[in-house]
């Protein structure tokens, strides 16, 4: 696998109960390929396969590793060396928490600690694991103490910290819906925008049969001074607003854009908005619900 062709690779590891599963879920929602508990010795084979067959489907690969894997400590260093020879330099995220917090989490979930049993009680198992993983902690690019984090806190921190490591996580998906007010407002919209103030090509006999997908309609609606001013301010508003929703942990937002019939003004505006948001690295879907009715 050539270095230029490799997917970004992260290894999420650390103390049991510190939040590894939560972090893996966060990355999965962000369109990373995630896998937990994979034997260390087969990681290189997995990455070769993904680089060959899944380059366009995922933003990267996130591997969850911990002491439950029988070969973890013995093969961890060797696996890193093999990856580096392949041109892959994995980033390591190490999760930890104070012992009281970990003990409380295990007591709450009533799940046994992986090292608990025999002469080791829960508190001793937590400390023993901390000592065993000290060399792994030393290799980490990012150490997160999750003692005071809620699940939502952890999600926000993961996004922020990963960006500081050189990654880019534009997590919010924007769903655009166009509609005609005379057919009803979409019930699944988070926000509704009424564009009936814009010039209406419906009353131009040469334009009436066209739709907002046609250049003539787009020029009529957004090419005039009123349309240009509106669209610039509308886009600026959304580019300010959407990151605020991202910061609150939202995964998606649905914007409904309406005009009288849902064929001209709303469609042309939504088409332009989709293109503009994609240039800002948002994942955008677009549905014209009433374009054939208006």
UniProtKB/Swiss-Prot annotation:
<dbReference type="InterPro" id="IPR005337">
    <property type="entry name" value="RapZ-like"/>
</dbReference>
<dbReference type="InterPro" id="IPR053931">
    <property type="entry name" value="RapZ_C"/>
</dbReference>
<keyword id="KW-0547">Nucleotide-binding</keyword>
<keyword id="KW-0067">ATP-binding</keyword>
<dbReference type="Pfam" id="PF22740">
    <property type="entry name" value="PapZ_C"/>
</dbReference>
<dbReference type="GO" id="GO:0005525">
    <property type="term" value="F:GTP binding"/>
</dbReference>
<comment type="similarity">
    <text>Belongs to the RapZ-like family.</text>
</comment>
<protein>
    <recommendedName>
        <fullName>Nucleotide-binding protein Dde_1774</fullName>
    </recommendedName>
</protein>
<feature type="binding site">
    <location>
        <begin position="14"/>
        <end position="21"/>
    </location>
    <ligand>
        <name>ATP</name>
    </ligand>
</feature>
<dbReference type="InterPro" id="IPR053930">
    <property type="entry name" value="RapZ-like_N"/>
</dbReference>
<dbReference type="InterPro" id="IPR027417">
    <property type="entry name" value="P-loop_NTPase"/>
</dbReference>
<keyword id="KW-0342">GTP-binding</keyword>
<feature type="binding site">
    <location>
        <begin position="66"/>
        <end position="69"/>
    </location>
    <ligand>
        <name>GTP</name>
    </ligand>
</feature>
<dbReference type="Pfam" id="PF03668">
    <property type="entry name" value="RapZ-like_N"/>
</dbReference>
<dbReference type="GO" id="GO:0005524">
    <property type="term" value="F:ATP binding"/>
</dbReference>
<comment type="function">
    <text>Displays ATPase and GTPase activities.</text>
</comment>
């Amino acid at each position: 696998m050539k270095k230029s062709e490799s997917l970004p690779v992260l290894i999420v590891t650390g103390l049991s109960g510190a939040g590894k599963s939560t972090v893996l879920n966060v990355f999965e929602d962000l369109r990373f390929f995630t896998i937990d508990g994979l034997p260390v010795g087969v990681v290189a084979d997995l990455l070769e396969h993904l680089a060959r067959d899944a380059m366009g489907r995922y933003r990267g690969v996130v591997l969850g590793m911990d002491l439950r894997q029988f070969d973890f400590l013995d093969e961890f260093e060797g696996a890193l060396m093999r990856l580096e020879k392949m041109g892959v330099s994995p980033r390591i995220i190490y999760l930890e928490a104070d012992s009281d917090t970990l003990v409380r989490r295990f007591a709450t979930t009533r799940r046994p600690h992986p090292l608990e049993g025999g002469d080791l009680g829960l508190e001793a198992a937590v400390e023993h694991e901390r000592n065993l993983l000290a060399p792994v902690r030393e290799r980490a690019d990012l150490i997160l103490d999750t003692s005071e984090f809620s699940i939502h806190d952890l999600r926000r921190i993961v996004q922020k910290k990963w960006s500081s490591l050189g990654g880019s996580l534009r997590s919010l998906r924007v769903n655009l819906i166009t509609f005609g007010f005379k057919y009803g407002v979409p019930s699944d919209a988070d926000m509704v925008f009424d564009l009936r103030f814009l010039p209406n090509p419906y009353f131009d006999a040469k334009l009436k049969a066209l739709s907002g997908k046609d250049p003539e309609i787009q020029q009529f609606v957004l090419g005039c001074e009123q349309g240009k001013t509106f669209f610039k301010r509308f886009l600026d508003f959304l580019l300010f607003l959407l990151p605020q929703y991202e910061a609150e942990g939202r995964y998606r937002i649905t914007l409904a854009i309406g005009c009288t019939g849902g064929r001209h003004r709303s469609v042309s505006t939504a088409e332009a908005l989709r293109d503009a948001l994609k240039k800002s690295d948002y994942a955008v879907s677009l549905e014209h619900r009433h374009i054939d009715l208006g």
